[in-house]
Amino acid sequence: MSDIYLQHLMTIIVSVFLRGYRGKTVDFSITSQHHRTTVAYFLNHGKWNDSALQKALKSSIVELIYQEARSSGQPIFCIVDDTIASHIKPSSQDLHPIEAAYFHQSHLKGRQDYGHQVVSVMLSCNGITLNYAVILYDKTKSKIKIVQDIATELPEAPVISYFLCDSWYTSAGIMKSFLEKGFYTIGNRILYPMGIRQKASELALRIRKSDPNVSLVTVDKRRFYVYRYEGNLNKISNAVVLLSYPEECFGNPKALRVFISTNVSLSTQEILDSYAKRWSIELFFRQSKQKLGLDKYQIRSSQGIQRYWLIMSFTHYLCCVCKGNHCTFEEGYFYLQKQLKEERITAIYRLIQHGASLEEVLTIAG
């Protein structure tokens, strides 16, 4: 990457830590000597090798997480989910609408939402959680194929590990791809006992608290009645399915949750405790929207959008490793924000000492 492009990259990263950052080109201009359109050109049309940055980032994350698994003996969790980076639908008169934006079903909002659908992959081990990939779902490739490709590119896990997902990704093909790399699956799933299609809600109607397969389990200080089924499923041999109700909502169809584990040696408690680690990707989405401009960026080209996401993923990684050892994104974010603020104050003090003009001081102060 040329020096000028490296400057643009650092401009974007540093701007993240400014108060009020939204991922808009006007934010980049605050920390750049160049006009905001120059930084936008760097994202949309610049001739730099973004795949090299992505490859280096993925390699660093795999090395860190897999080494932690080897030294600690703890499992690796590959966590996959998707979210929507919402945007306002352009008018029919708009000559340059944002590329690759569509209407998607938002489960959070309970309606169709316009924007970009983001498939994200996190790798986690022994308390270390890093964003491995952020992928644009543009309908040229199915989400199932996107996740299968992720499974294919990951190295074989050095210890027994787990792929955590919701019902969208618990297809037999994806689970097989991950199992080949040493990852069992723990996720949501519609139940197909003994190869016969049957809704989980129908099976749940026959469950009683006194059933020998029902146990009371505590997960994150909440108690659940859980029915355990072990056997063959449609296209899956010998898996565990858990039908779960909150203790106070037993028998309420709306409260029913269904989980699957392809590792039948895990206890009910272990399955639910492992699935709870999937929360880290929801936290990542929230943090990305609040601090990395995931749903506020104003970039029109598909290439520019994917490059922006890559830089934000790199920024997330920097926050998690910036203190010399691993920390949470929030800890690293505020640490770097404080460091940059102290550096700016020091620069202002030195300018004043050397008799700088008011205009020069105001420029540094931003």
Where does each model-flagged region fall?
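Gly/serine-rich nucleotide phosphate-binding loop at the start of the catalytic core
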Residues: 1-53, 57
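Extended, non-catalytic structural segments that build the interaction scaffolds
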Residues: 12, 254-278
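An internal, acidic/charged active-site-proximal segment
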Residues: 135-245, 325-339, 358, 362-364
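Basic, amphipathic alpha-helical segments enriched in Lys/Arg and hydrophobic/aromatic residues
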Residues: 296-347
